[in-house]
Amino acid sequence: MSNGLQLTLTFKKSMWNTPMEYKDLSQYKEIAIDLETKDDGLNNKLGAGWAIGKGEIVGFAVAVEGWKGYFPFGHLGGGNMIPEQVKKYMKDICALPCTKIFHNAQYDVGWLEASGIPVHGPIVDTMIAAALIDENRFSYSLNALSVDYLNEIKAETELREAAAAHGIDPKAEMWKLPAEHVGYYAEQDAELTLKLWQRFKQEIATQSLTTVWEMEQQLLPILIKMRQRGVRVQVEKAEALQKEMKNQEQELLKAIKKESGIEVDIWASRQIAKAFDKMKLDYPRTEKTKEPSFTQNWLINNKNKIAQLIVSAREINKFHGTFLSSIMKYQVNGRIHGEINQLRGDNGGTVSGRLSMSNPNLQQVPARNKDFGPKIRSLFIPEDGYKWGSFDYSQQEPRMTVHYAASIGEGYEGSNELVQAYQNSQADFHQTVADLVGIERTQAKTIGLGLMYGMGKQKLAISLGVSKDEANELIIKYNKKVPFVKKLSDRCKYAADEKGVIRTKKGRKCRFDMWETRDFGLHVAEKYEDAVAKYGKDNIKRAFTYKALNRLIQGSSADQTKQSMLDCYEDGHLPILQIHDELCFNVKDEKHAKQIQKKMQNPIEFKVPSVVEYGLGESWGDAK
């Protein structure tokens, strides 16, 4: 046994016994599976260990209608069945063509496949289903969902008592316990997963989520393969770059001290304020607390030398302290196997449906900084014999905005003209708007995205680097020349206020289930029952509906990107990474790149054609 010496522990006798047989499940249409593992990846905060070879499966729980069983084979505390027999049983079950149901399938399927056990048949993830059914939940744990949807609670008392008696963490070190104290718990996990799926099937149908559910279900195996393969990274080059950046940061800090006469903590607004005060320079304060406020946008737009030095020092500190340190921490044999969050979950994910990453978050790798962005991105390289291909949706969000504005009735004023303009693949939404309004493109982009995101005037003023009054004038000017953005925003807000939900192109629901008082001021959003009890039924309104347009655009962008990933994979192209509006692939040549570009171009039909721009290079940073 690979766990080393067997641990002998003494406990009161459990009610659970090992299964008497390896039950034939070939006639069942649905099988729920739950694994117990020794996970040295999770235990060392490196993400699930299956992709990096840290840990192993120690037990296999399975449930079908009317029967459940737990088959332990790697518990340090003993009570194991014959490992070869259990592994064969696992393999036989996973080879069946029926539907396999998991809670957090990326974890369990990842471990199975890393152990040489491919999972055949459709894969269902009840955690993904739960996030589609309600993206605003506090928790997506099996226990929390079972309580809310099944009125059942996991029986963990015996497990916790046994763990506490011997100083063992009941979750991270469950593999150390005798199997008899884990068996019932493991069986119940599989059984509850099966029961949840019966309930969620009905919810998906009732809420008309079948189309988007099928897309998410098909995407799951692709995400597992992406993490399994990982991203190649040049470790020695990363170490050298980190050393170089640390030296550059020290030089910048010396320059800041020379300019201001004092040492400045570049991340502490109060300390920066002292430097500005000493130099008799103005700076903004927060509206509520009147504390100094030095946002990155404000500093970037400030022309004073010290502001620019602080911007540079902050950037370089973040580059080496966040990005390069993460590369060193998470790389295994020259690859990074970041976790991909498909939807909302207890360990991350977005409410919009967009993919996110953790352990590490490669979506934070900088792109805009012209000096350091390419240097850090150049650390990531394709497989041997390939080029790195970066495929980017050009102006994905503005195109979505124009599509929806033109889709309401005969189209909001100005939207159809933009639809026509977008028939030219070189059309630039922000430049077109800038020309109409008579402002700079950067201002047009900031205002446009601010309106799409539901940004307030104060925040927009800081982003633009102007006063609140000047920002207000620019917004009025913008809305006069490009009225459809505000009209669409108001329409989305109204729909969210009235119905509490809006839907994306694929039918993904964006819900607004929290409530707040109608009284002016800042308030905590609450559940309907709590808000009614506190403020009265007639004095409450739905919260966060000003974000409705943003939710619609982000959700539709997620639909488009995910459908593209499916289409590309079906054509034989497995993505390396998905970063915001960008998909990265291993690409052989220009012909291969054109095939991917064509697949990505219009996976979902919109009034405005999608444009995918791509670049090829020896690394991510060189892909131009």
Question: Where do the PLM segments sit?
Answer:
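Conserved pre-motif C helix in the palm subdomain of viral-like polymerases
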Residues: 188-195, 394, 546-566
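Active-site palm subdomain of RNA-directed nucleic acid polymerases
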Residues: 204-214, 560-583
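Conserved beta-strand -> loop -> alpha-helix junction used to position metal-binding or nucleic-acid-contacting
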Residues: 118-135, 142-144, 426-430
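Conserved "right-hand" nucleotidyltransferase catalytic core of DNA-directed polymerases
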Residues: 2-76, 120, 137, 147-372, ...
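Acidic beta-strand-to-loop metal/phosphate-binding motif
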Residues: 32, 97-108, 390
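Short active-site loop/helix that positions an aromatic residue
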Residues: 39-42, 106-117, 130-133, 273-280, ...
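A common structural junction motif
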Residues: 482, 598-608
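Nucleic-acid-processing active sites and adjacent nucleic-acid-binding tracks
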Residues: 65-100
